[in-house]
Structure formats: structure tokens, C-alpha cells
Amino acid sequence: MSIDEAAAAYVQHVADVRRLSPATVRAYRSDLAGLAEACEHADLADVDLEQLRDWLWHAVQRGDSRATIARRTAAVRGFFAWAAETGRISADPSLRLVTPKRGRSLPQVATADTLADVLTRLEATATGGDPAALRDYAVLELLYGAALRVSELCGLDVDDLDLDRRTARVVGKGAKERVVPFGGPASRAIDAYLVRGRPALAQRAEGGARALFLGSRGGRMGSRAVYSLVSRELGPGLGATVGPHALRHSAATHLLDGGADLRAVQEILGHASLGTTQIYTHVSSERLAAAYRLAHPRA
């Protein structure tokens, strides 16, 4: 069940069963619609705590009032508690969700060294030729290398890639198309997957002929499988709630740390507003300040 479908059912529940006021029902409907958009209309079961925190944190950065943010927190906690109670999800990701305070940092990002270690390990595993290992390595290299949303990655077709130019054509929020670059490691990982991994996966079933990344049964790889992959590989270092968006956060932060132009990063990420991208400059500044405090004798 998608988060949109579940949200519609919950809004009906609070209106008909809990009999909340019409104004509160309208507010909850709006809040949950915003959450669904932020989560890229994913399956309800794929939404995790980090995404919920990230969504609320963005509201803080926009300057939304304390009362509005508190209401959104209540709406989300009520929604997921109801979803768990009614069997729509097996676990409630909002149990540890609290109203964020102003100044809260971004959800945790992986360091460049941490990601290098993970990707090096996956590359070594992929050299054995297992189709799933080749795919998994290519997935993580491209997620991080191109700073993609999980929906953008899962929606890629083989024809969307230009390995010579190292670019991918993706469809982002609002069905907006953009071309994003990726580096040599991602290009080599994808090439190896296309030559040695994907053909083996494609033989298992029909229906994924155009899709770049195929699942174990030969169809298009879904967001849930990508979430499981990222959690398995990055969870030990970043926490059990880590998801694909952590790689996007990390890529944006590392680009700015490396001196990339803010507007270039905006285009890579597909942000409609430069203000959304500027959030990552706060992270870079905080990292610099932390390094200063640790290293400077007069800090």
C-alpha cells in the first residue's frame, strides 16, 4: 500500500471515527500530503524514522511556526500508530519521533572514508561475478555518485544511460527531467553489471526488459529492495534506520565540502528552490566548525 492510499484512509478515519474538527482534518490531510510528497509517494512500509525527521527538519528550516511543526509531528505519529494497529505496517517508525528544535543538524551523513570502505568491499564482492552482487555494487555507486532519489534510481531504464559521457537522464519530482553526471567508479560498476549481471537476472522473468536495475525475479528493482540493500550495507556504521536518502545527503554535503558551486549542486539534486540546497551549506559549515574546535589550540 502506498503512503498516499494509507493517508487517505487515515484522514477518513479521523473524520468519521475520531470525529476531529473539520479544521483539524483539513490540516492533517495537508500535512500527510506533504509527507507523501517528501517520501516520493513510496510504499508505506518503506518510510523510516530518518525520512520523518528529515521532513520535519526541512519545515524548521523554512521557518514554519512551532505550533505548525508540533501539529505535524502529532499528525504523523497518529498516522503511523494507526497504520501499525490496523496491520498496514509491521513496525511504527514514528515511535522515537519528536518535534525538532531549531538548529537541529541534518540527518547523519556518511563520511567519504566510510563510503569508500563500503564501496571497496562491495566492489571486491562483485568481482566474483554473482549477478546480485554486481547489481548491488552498481546501485550504491550510482545512488551516491549521482546523488539520486530512490524513485529516480528505480525508474531508470537502460536507454537513460550514456556511459561514454557518464550521464543519466532521470525523472524527478513533478515529472521534471534532468541529466545528471556520475563518475568513473559508477560507470565501471554499471558497465560490469550490464555485461555480466543484468543478462542473468533478465533470464529469470519477463517484464523488466527496459529497466536498468532488475530484482531477483527479473522485474524492475523496487524501492523496498533498495532500502534493504542500503540498510544492510550502511546500517552497521550509521544506524538501523539509514535509507537511500542518506547517500543523497552525503553526496550533496561532500560536493559542497569539495568546493562545488551551490547552483551546480542544485541542478544535480533537482531542487526547484536554491533555498532547499542551501541547507547543505549549514552542514559543511558545522563540519568545519567541529574540525576547528578539535584542532585549533585557541578554539
Regions found by a protein language model. Name each.
Residues 1-299:
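Conserved catalytic core of the tyrosine transesterase superfamily
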